[in-house]
């Protein structure tokens, strides 16, 4: 549904969408301690970690808890540092990078260039199959010097179960269209 149509609807759809958005924000914040634990474990295993989030508040909480300013975000306050943060991560000067999935899902290469620190991506789910597919492609490249691990982190019994079902169906449909196998 287009945003302009949402505003015009008077049957409560806009408030329902807002409620879903707020629920997703809360659930993503609940995952901060889990993300911190997963990042710390990956660092102990000599990996570098990309954390993809949907909401600025989550990125700020992770930045504080993980003591990192290495952020790729669509906000103006991070614009100057964006390329430097990417370069520092790629050069293994920074081992953690926090990425807003909307701002860094496409056109961003974060794979292992040096062979020193394999990559792990932790992805907080988005309703957008395109953004999810793009996020999974940021740490994996044919030219990578090591294998990557990617984890999509959903929280059971929350709004994210619907996100999971929705994005799974969308990804399957994308694969059918892209693979050209519409007969099965």
Protein language model annotation of sequence segments:
Residues 1-47, 53-57, 61-65, 170-184:
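Interdomain linker/hinge connecting the two RecA-like lobes of the SF2 helicase core
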Residues 17, 24, 75-76, 163:
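Helix-centric, low-specificity signal for extended rod-like, repetitive segments
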Residues 36-40, 63, 86, 136, ...:
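Short amphipathic alpha-helical segments and helix-helix/interface helices
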Residues 46-48, 94-95:
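Pre-Walker A (Motif I) flank of P-loop NTPase domains
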Residues 51-52, 153:
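Active-site-adjacent beta-strand anchor residues
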Residues 59, 70-162, 170:
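Conserved RecA-like P-loop NTPase helicase motor core
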Residues 167:
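C-terminal anion-handling pockets and recognition modules
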